[in-house]
Design a protein with these regions (language model features):
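Hydrophobic faces of well-ordered beta-strands that scaffold small-molecule active sites
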Residues: 1, 16-18, 52-58, 94-96, ...
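Active-site beta-loop-alpha junctions enriched in small/polar residues
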Residues: 1, 21-23, 59-61, 99-101, ...
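Short, acidic/polar
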Residues: 1-7, 74-83, 183-190
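Acidic (Asp/Glu)-rich catalytic clusters
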Residues: 6-13, 32-55, 80-90, 118-125, ...
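Structural motif corresponding to the early beta-alpha repeats
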Residues: 18-108, 245
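Alpha-helix N-cap and loop-to-helix initiation/capping positions
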Residues: 27-35, 66-78, 104-115, 139-147, ...
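Active-site acidic/histidine proton-transfer and metal-coordination neighborhood
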Residues: 64-162
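Histidine-acidic metal/acid-base catalytic patches
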Residues: 149-167, 171-321
Length: 321
């Protein structure tokens, strides 16, 4: 049951994520008392603090920004149910994709999202809603730091709201984290626009797609367009120390969850390392070589997409000439 979701991880990591129910169904059976007890026992046995070290991921169905009132109400009910499950388990953080405007006015969408959070906070006691930054595809909101800041501004109880930065999503949205100067600039902007006091978690993912692609395509650490240096910078940034950092990287079909264990060891190994460390440079080069073919494939797809988008513009220019 619930505890089986993290049996693969407890010997290797000190934070983890899970789903509270079937993430692709609106309604799921209530948590069984035996599962709740077992969850608490496992957390105690393996020294997890559920208030600060466990980050459940919200259902993919939930869209608090939906302009359709009936569908938005359905999303709110599912959202509140998730938060209540967190509190049954003693979990203090809950990760949420902000939502989509579905083509409606963006400012009204942000208000609807905040209204949904405010309603849920009134119905629950302590769990913090952690808004995740998004890649920027289509009408999804949350790819810009200003989106997250505006939602937070509209939330009444600001002690109950925070932010999770997903490295793949940030990169896909156009934030370059690959070298020190730009990495530092991103976090300076984050502190100015949102504020470190709201930073509650990190999702550690490399990116299969290029910078600014708006594609939410996670890759294993060091194999993608972000590369190893971005993660060296992250694990050595003092302001991020102590936050739950969750890997959402692809599983290897042969190794299964073991690939995550290897990535955890790699990230721990990077702590205290400098950018010019010969071992780090060699490891980075090896990982980039391993991921080169897949990067080339996605770069071509992205280039083809840009070229396709440019064709109507070229034809339109000719018509006006």
């Amino acid at each position: 049951m619930l505890t089986n979701l993290f049996l693969f991880f407890f010997c290797r990591c000190n934070a983890f994520a899970l789903f509270l129910k079937n993430q692709r169904r609106w309604v799921s059976p209530a948590l069984k008392p035996a599962d709740i007890t077992a969850f608490h026992e496992f957390c105690k046995k393996y020294n997890y603090n559920p208030r600060t070290e466990i980050l459940p991921h919200g259902s993919y169905l939930i869209n608090l920004g939906n302009p359709d009132a009936a569908k938005r109400e359905q999303a709110r009910d599912a959202f509140i149910d998730d938060l209540r499950r967190c509190e049954q388990l003693g979990i203090g953080l809950y990760n949420l994709h902000p939502g989509s405007s579905l083509g409606s006015d963006k400012q009204e969408t942000l208000q609807r999202i905040a209204d949904g959070i405010n309603d849920a906070i009134k119905e629950t006691e302590f769990v913090k809603v952690v808004l995740e930054n998004m890649a920027g595809h289509g009408h999804i909101v949350g790819s810009q730091l200003e989106d997250l800041a505006q939602i937070i501004e509209l939330v009444q109880d600001k002690a109950r709201v925070g932010v999770c930065i997903d490295t793949c999503h940030a990169f896909a949205a156009g934030f370059d984290l690959r070298e020190s100067t730009k990495f530092t600039a991103f976090w300076a902007d984050f502190d100015r626009i949102v504020g470190y006091k709201y930073l509650a978690a990190i999702h550690l993912n490399d990116s299969k797609a290029p910078l600014g692609s708006k594609r939410d395509l996670h890759q294993n650490i060091g194999l993608g367009f972000l590369g190893l240096e971005a993660f060296r910078l992250i694990v050595n940034k003092p302001e991020l120390e102590g936050l739950p950092m969750v890997l959402e990287t692809p599983e290897d079909a042969k190794l299964g969850h073991d690939v995550r264990g290897d990535e955890i060891k790699l990230l721990e190994w990077l702590v205290g390392k400098d950018a010019d460390d010969e071992e780090v440079l060699a490891k980075s080069k090896a990982l980039q070589a391993k991921g080169a073919k897949e990067r080339a494939e996605h770069q071509k797809k992205y280039n083809d997409k840009l070229e396709k988008e440019e064709r109507p513009k070229k034809r339109q220019r000719k018509l006006f000439e």
